[in-house]
Amino acid sequence: MKLKLTVLLILVHASASYKPPAIEVEDYQVQEHDSIGKFVELEEHTRLILKCSAHHNGDLKYNFPSMEGNVGYDENNFKKRMEEYYDDAFGDKVLTLNDVRESDTGTYSCSSMEHSSLNDTIYVFVHRKKVFLPLKSVMIIYKQGEVMVPCKTTKFVDKSDIELYASNVLVKEASKYNYDQRYGFKITKKLYSEKQIVDVNFECRYKKEENQTATYIITEKEASSDDGYHFSWEKGFQWPHVGYNFSLTCNLNYNGSKIFHGYTNKLSIECPQCSHDPGSHVHVDRHRIIGNKISTTVRIQHLELEDSGKYTCIWEHENKETKYTDYHLYVAPKKAQIKVIETSPTIMRIKENRATSLTAKFAIYPFEKESYTAKWSRIYNSSIHEGPQSETIINDDFRKIAATSFGDGAFSENLDIKAFAVSTNMSGTYVLSISHMDTVQVVQWEVAIENDEPDVQITVREPSSFFISNQEYYKPDTNLHIECISISIPPADVVFEYKTKNSEQFQEIEPNKLVSVGGTFDRGLIYNVTFTEGMDLKCSSIRKGNRAITVNKLIKIGEGFEVRPHHEKSSKATESEPSKIIYEGDNVKLTCVFPLDSDDWSVSWRFENSKSSDISSIPTTTETEIKQYSKHLILNLRDVTTSFTGTYTCVVKNEDSEKLLETSIDVKAISKPSITGGNSNAVVIVDYDQYFEINCNMTGTPPPVYQWFKDGNPYTHGDVDGSILRVSRARGEDDGEFHCLATNRAGDKLNSIEVQVNNAPKGSLFFYWFLALLLLISIIAVFLLTCKLRASNRLTKQKDIALNTLYETMIKHQAGPLPEEMKDLPVEERTYYLPYNNDYEIDPVNLEILNPIGSGHFGVVKKGLLGMAYPKSKIESKTRLPVAVKSSTNPFNVELQKMMAEELKVMCAIPKNPNVLALIGAVTKNMRQGQLYIVTEFIDGGNLREFLQAHRNTFINELVEDEHVPVDDSYLVPNSVKKKIYKFDEKLGEGTRLLVEDPDALCTSDLLSIGLQIAKGMAWLADVPCVHRDLACRNVLITKTKIVRIADFGLSKKHTNKTYYRTKKSKDTPLPVRWMPLECIEEFKFTQKSDVWSFGICLYEIFTLGGTPYPNCDTFNVIEFIRNGNRNKQPEYCHDEIYELMKVCWQFNPKDRPTFNDCITFFENHMRDSSSQFLERVENMLHTEMQEQSKLDDWIQDSRPDVPNVSFQKSPKKQKEERYLIVESHA
């Protein structure tokens, strides 16, 4: 038994060892054809890579075609372009042929050096322009016998497209049977009718392209005396079938020059059922001699299936060797037949995204009858579904089916697959089923489509229905059917892993919990599990050492992702309102539901409608609720208006995904009830004791509630149906005026209808007494209203006098000299003594106020256009300067106007500086009518905080860790700590990254420049002196060229009252405590040193790109946090030296803090050390900005000289004035 097993193993090993090698081609489609085998087509100057692999351990070698006769072949050049080596990873012998040439066309083979019989071949076509391969010699001399006309091709062509001409005469039979793309035409005497081939011009032509020909001169040596015989079967009936009377003749022809002796030759036919008996089923005639020809015929009466087989004709000669020729007869079982003539390669291995086509040429019999039908399909095995899967192929965007008729029953079917549809999952067996009458013929192609790397997929299904859900979120105890599938040709190994929330590394799922599956183009693993906790899944596909991976996350959730709208009616709503319609004044609550399982969710709300895409444009509040497996982010919309109409999107994001959950609300505008039909005080005439109805003729939005009154009392004798009062019986008391009161949340409206009841009994005088009383009440009400209006007029007059007094004292009146004891006070604390410079006064005619661009507690800022007060030319008269126009929120509030006037006088007292917002002028003369406008520069970049936040995604960090370890290894500077240094872009040159012109770019050097500019601006204010009191990035403006302006320093004094800077825990009071030192919060003491503290906070905002100070500390705990000695941590983009400056600014004792001049010196030294050109460029830009700022006076003052030889007088302002030049602010 052991001996038998040993022998069996040896045989198995020997069988594997003697398996021939196989050639694969990289990057090109390998095709196969019945006549020439495997082949590949290339264009000239591309690269050919062949890989030869074998199962035995012997050496492999490549054999090359004979190319010496090809035009352009050079042996040395071929060797230079050719490279052979072994692939150590897989043991393959690799042949690389670079820059392939047309002359490289031919058969390449790979064989075992130990067993040369083990080999594999592939024919390589290399095409340039010519279809026929150019040869060095076109004169061919052959010996007696068959001749090859060597019209080889440089690409694979259909045989029927190549024609052979001999002396310009078409050789018709040559193309059908005797052409091979590798060698050319095989010429026999049967094909060529001339007696001898002597210096004949043969020409090969390609029918599909003009001028594609090849010409050869072929000559024949003189034939010997033994030649001249032609022995063959005569062509018989092509469609033999059961019941047909069939005959087949064998001929021997002599065309030689000698005398033919027929008696020396004998022909006979042999077959299993052959007989010389005339009555037999298969009868063979005796041979007949006619001239130089001998023939014998086999005759079969009523063909049967058993007559199929080999029929042999035997030629016997006295002086020659006996010769044989065979004819293979196939008897079809039916008359209707289909024969496949030619197909495109039936085994195909191609690359993805390369167009391909499948073609079959066939003939049908009898073709006079009904035509054929054809059906294309694809059969493949799926790793998911059991059994073979079939797909019927039709014409669509990916595949095209075409049919061609050649006549005489010959046809072709073609399936073209477009390049973008050629993917690995389209592999399989492609089947063409041809039906003709009662016969079916099937042609198959095995198509394997290789991909560069496996396509790995994780699919989650519900097991009972196999419905693909592929969601991330599932409720606990859900049964899941999870597939890890790799779509790959060649096949790849699959690994399925998982990781729970509590584990750090992925680990393989236990094999006994997995089911292995496979198909034509895919392999995979199936994991059936009951979902209990969140997990990460990883599916890996490994092929030739390369790994493709996909990861999926399954999260536990109690509720699905959704937005739930909830609608609460206004307290003013009436019971008649439709419950589902949202009206102005209602409250809406939008609840965004998302998972609790993960902590890295970022959830926010977006809002969009036709007018706005910013949710800050509408007042909202948010709150968060935590459920068992979910979180709820609730957006509260209170007292909604039509501006709330739009789409609300809850944006739920984490590192891997983003979900947009949308809902829309439509807020209907409300309108007070109004009369819509008929007239007020209409008259309705009714008959006593009869039915009548009256219509209120009023409507509103929402639909109002209707109440009816008669003689001042509610009317209770009828039924109210909407706006109609239905009365079943008219009474005498119904005579008179009815009142209808329509009420909704927008208000109410009263309408009166007079009802006249005919034939009613006379009533009492009570009604007239009631009218008299009503008239008396009306007179009293008019008297009271008159008194109230007179009181209101007195109040308005008092405000008018107060505003005029304010103007006289604050603007027009110039106070005396400043007392000595007040000279050291900040400028904002001595505003009474500050003069208002009338040179700043702007004529309202020159100022056009546009849309609002910002607002605060006390003032509102609008964009404006300023015209020149004293233009020197027509162009200047039509030029407009964009400006910012500030006014109070209530122009008739004396206290607010006083604050505005004080701010104006403070700004007048501060000289222009490129880092301080400049005053252009003001409108003060109409303060009595509420017109007090402060006109400043228009800064196009907005406030600094929003600017920094907007550039977070595009920020360029120029701060890196120093790779050099410091020498000093003290406890202050340990070697383990690496310092941060600047690394500016070397391509741009040193320091040139500063203030780049691209507004979308922001880098570390820009942050340094911004910090220096704020220090310069605050130092300028400190020299006035002026204490800002509210320095923060929100109060710093920035231009698109990254020049900053300190703003809102004029109103700072008004915040010293304790209603603004109190520390009471009230969320309704704005408290900038995150920017203030303790002495400001607790003692309300504001100095330049408190501004320095705020400057340090500003630096923190800058280097966190708009971050909030003390981010992990609640607002109400900030004071205690600071008091305990805690400070902000060092920002990521902040240099160590900058952070040291911040900490000095945050010293508890104000005396220990630096001055702003100290801060300027620090920044200049720091920037100078970082870059030799850095500081210089900043100073140059600020100098240019100062020059531009000084030109602002030209817009309101007559300080410029007239234009020479130009006389111009400003025309009166028109209602519609042409403005063809708008000058943007230099900022």
Swiss-Prot record:
Please list every transmembrane segment annotated in the UniProt record, as residue ranges. Answer: 765-785
Asked if Protease is a keyword of the record, the answer is: no
User: Which residues lie in Basic and acidic residues bias regions?
Assistant: 1214-1227
Chemical reaction(s) catalysed = L-tyrosyl-[protein] + ATP = O-phospho-L-tyrosyl-[protein] + ADP + H(+)
- Spell out the GO cellular component terms annotated for this protein, sorted alphabetically and separated by semicolons: plasma membrane; receptor complex
What region holds the Ig-like C2-type domain?
A: 20-110, 200-325, 565-666, 673-758
Q: Which GO terms fall under molecular function for this chain's record?
A: ATP binding; transmembrane receptor protein tyrosine kinase activity
User: In the record, which residues are listed under signal peptide?
Assistant: 1-17
Please state what the protein is called: Tyrosine-protein kinase receptor ver-3
